[in-house]
């Protein structure tokens, strides 16, 4: 006796279910391939404790690194309220307390589970270098206070230290070249090392020091000015030097102190300041000038007296006064020498000028790569404006307003006569605050170097299918389910009959 139509349908559905189910298993098990899951994101925190203020930066990078160095990007920046940590000599604990608000903001961004593995570092620069020279005990107390605050936070605290000027310059060089894609760039779906080309030099003007860093055309003859790096599998040799006491704030204080000493010797009162606008007048405490080891005093000078200063708005004499703060004669006749007897190869390639280089020229609207003649003309004309006109023209900017003339002329003296840029090489300088969305400074370069010391995590392997195989598997799974449900329905109706 043959099978009934119900039996034939039932058997057919079971056959379809078995065939499609077997096909689905083959697709899942046999056609699967090994794939890498996206790497976990790691975070790092760096405090830049400068002479005038402190900033916090949060960086992030994939856990699996490219050629032993993390592919780092900036995730957060936070400027801490108050002065630089070197100002807290009378109450060092406040230096640590000042960091808390920005640290809390950083921890809110980073997943809580990753707080204990987030490397955190505080680097102090020229302000603390000067304090260490003046009073090493006070400098140690401040570093101890900030270390205590950060070590109590839930992060992996790597330490707080005074950064050497050479490191500050070299890490700034790394930052610029990394952000501009000179060290590593993304192309055709992967990170690759770019061909050897035009690496960019770094010009940094802080409050207490200035740094120049670049790769010269020839060999670096003075090994004390050479720093070597290995980043993303490539080696780099960079010339770098830091000039302490030649930062913006210190040079302006040194200039005022020199004018005050000259006034004392000539018995002329008040001090006539050629870099201040005509009509400007102020009474300044003389003692504040001599807090820094950058300024050498004379026994005959009474530090308790006040100083009356009058501006004359004379850019020519301002340049003469600024030049007197350099020792150019020590490099006379030497091709590879900047000033103060310091070795420097001839500048080569493109340069990014940042920090106070940028802030000063941004105020003067000189960041659009104007010619040297235009820059000179603009700065001189600004210096010759009467103080009352300057005040009216720039409301709400009183804090730094009197100093932009001196700062602009100082930058020209430093770059042209100090670092030996010329009218031909001037167009190679770009005045920038950021490259892309990243602030230019030493902190990113430090974090890139630091990630070379942080162990990489092995990428996680999973079994997966291509999209077409996955789609086919879903179709056969649905077909199997429909066949089984159909067979079950037939069985139920069959039993009822």
UniProtKB/Swiss-Prot annotation:
A cellular component term, taken from the record's GO annotations: membrane
Keywords: ATP-binding, Calcium, Cell membrane, Disulfide bond, Glycoprotein, Hydrolase, Magnesium, Membrane, Metal-binding, Nucleotide-binding, Transmembrane, Transmembrane helix
Tissue and organ distribution: Expressed in liver, jejunum and kidney.
UniProt xrefs under InterPro entries: GDA1_CD39_NTPase (IPR000407)
Pfam families, alphabetized: GDA1_CD39
Gene3D superfamilies: 3.30.420.40, Exopolyphosphatase. Domain 2
Localisation: Cell membrane
Cofactor: Ca(2+); Mg(2+)
One term of GO molecular function: apyrase activity
Residues at the active site: 168
Extracellular-facing ranges: 30-473
Membrane-topology descriptor: Multi-pass membrane protein
Cystines in this chain: 78-102, 245-294, 331-337, 383-405
UniProt domain comment: The transmembranous domains are involved in regulation of enzyme activity.
Family: Belongs to the GDA1/CD39 NTPase family.
Name of the featured protein: Ectonucleoside triphosphate diphosphohydrolase 8
Species of origin: Mus musculus (Mouse)
Lineage: Eukaryota, Metazoa, Chordata, Craniata, Vertebrata
Annotated gene: Entpd8
